[in-house]
Design a protein with these regions (language model features):
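Extracytoplasmic/periplasmic mature domains of Sec-exported, cell-envelope-associated bacterial proteins
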Residues: 28, 32-34, 39-40, 75-79, ...
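Acidic/histidine-rich catalytic neighborhood of metal-dependent amide-processing enzymes
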Residues: 44-47, 68-154, 244
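Solvent-exposed loop/turn segments at secondary-structure junctions
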Residues: 3, 39-41, 54-56, 66-70, ...
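Hydrophobic residues within well-ordered alpha-helices
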Residues: 19, 85, 185-186
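Soluble metallo-hydrolase cores and metallopeptidase-like ectodomains found primarily
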Residues: 1-75, 90, 94-102
Length: 273
C-alpha cells in the first residue's frame, strides 16, 4: 500500500475516535516529518511508434506507456502494457492482409509525470486521422479484463462482443477519467478507452511501489489479454464497427464534478470557461 493511503486511514480513525468521544482526535493524529534530498533535471522523452496494415490516412491506435513510477520496477504498470502492444502487433501482422485500416502501435514516454507522450501524439496528429484509441495500462494482474469506455458506446460494444466470443470475463465503466494516456484523446472527443485488469487486490495493488516486480505476473494472464485485445483491435481495423467521435463540449459536460475540480486545481482543465 502507498504511504499516503495509510496516513489517510490513520487520520480518519483519529477523527472518528474524537467524534465518538473515545479519543482526543487531535492528540491521536500522527506526526510526520519528511526529509527529501533529490533534484529535477531536464531530460528527453520519446514515443516509440510502429505500424501494421494498409497505408491509410486514418489509423486505429493501440497504446501503452513505457515509463514507470519513479519508485517502482513497473512490471504491471506498465511493462506488461508495453509488452502487450508489441505482442498484439505481432499477432496482427499475421492477418495484415485482412485489415482495412492501419493500426498504429505506440508506447508513450512520460505518462507518470503528466501524460506528456500522449499529449504530444494527440496535439501533433489531426483528429480525423485517429479512428479510435485502445490504451493498455496495468493489464496483467489477472485474466479479468476491465475497459473504461469514457462513454464511447461503440467501443464498449466491441469489447462486449469479444468477451462473449471467448467466454471471457469483462467489466466496463462509463465514467470519463483523466487518469491514463487515453485522456489526451478523450478530452478532444476522440473515441478512446483504457483496458486494464482487475484482481482481488484492493486499489492499484503493487502498482507505484518497489514490489511491482516481474515475479508477480503470470504469462498466462498476458496471453489471455493479448488474445482479447487483438480480437478487439482487429474488429476496429476491419471496419466491423465505427467508433463515433464526440464534440469537446459533450465530453466537458459529461465529466464528473470531482474530476472537474481535480483538473482545475491541478491546472489541467483543457476547456475555456
Amino acid at each position: 500500500k502507498e504511504v499516503g493511503d495509510r496516513l489517510s486511514r490513520l487520520v480518519a480513525a483519529a477523527d472518528a475516535d474524537g467524534a465518538e468521544g473515545e479519543g482526543s482526535g487531535d492528540a491521536d493524529r500522527p506526526t510526520v516529518s519528511i526529509d527529501v534530498d533529490c533534484r529535477n533535471e531536464p531530460t528527453t522523452s520519446v514515443n516509440a511508434v510502429a505500424e501494421v496494415g494498409p497505408d491509410t490516412e486514418e489509423a486505429v491506435y493501440l497504446t501503452a506507456h513505457v515509463d514507470a513510477h519513479d519508485v517502482s520496477d513497473g512490471a504491471n504498470d506498465n511493462g506488461a502494457g508495453s509488452a502487450l502492444v508489441a505482442e498484439v502487433g505481432r499477432l496482427l501482422a499475421g492477418v495484415e492482409g485482412d485489415l482495412d485500416t492501419r493500426v498504429r502501435l505506440v508506447t508513450f514516454g512520460s505518462e507518470e509525470i503528466g501524460l506528456w507522450g500522449a499529449y504530444h501524439a494527440a496535439e501533433t496528429t489531426p483528429k480525423e486521422e485517429i479512428a479510435c484509441v485502445v490504451n493498455l495500462d496495468g493489464a496483467c494482474s489477472s485474466r479479468n479484463l476491465r475497459v473504461g469506455t469514457n462513454g464511447f458506446d461503440g467501443m464498449r460494444s466491441v469489447f462486449e462482443d469479444v468477451a462473449d466470443a471467448f467466454d471471457a470475463p469483462l467489466t466496463t465503466g462509463e465514467t470519463i477519467s483523466p487518469h491514463g494516456d487515453q485522456w489526451a484523446f478523450v478530452q478532444e472527443g476522440i473515441p478512446a478507452v483504457m483496458a486494464s485488469t482487475t484482481s482481488d487486490q484492493s486499489g492499484r495493488g503493487w502498482g507505484h511501489t518497489h514490489a511491482d516486480t516481474l515475479d508477480k505476473l503470470d504469462s498466462r494472464d498476458l496471453r489471455e489479454m493479448a488474445t482479447l485485445v487483438t480480437a478487439a483491435v482487429y474488429r476496429f481495423a476491419t471496419g466491423e464497427v465505427a467508433a463515433e467521435h464526440r464534440s469537446r463540449e459533450s465530453i466537458r459536460d459529461a465529466i464528473d464534478e470531482g474530476y472537474v475540480e481535480e483538473l482545475k486545481t491541478g491546472g489541467r482543465w483543457p476547456y475555456d470557461e
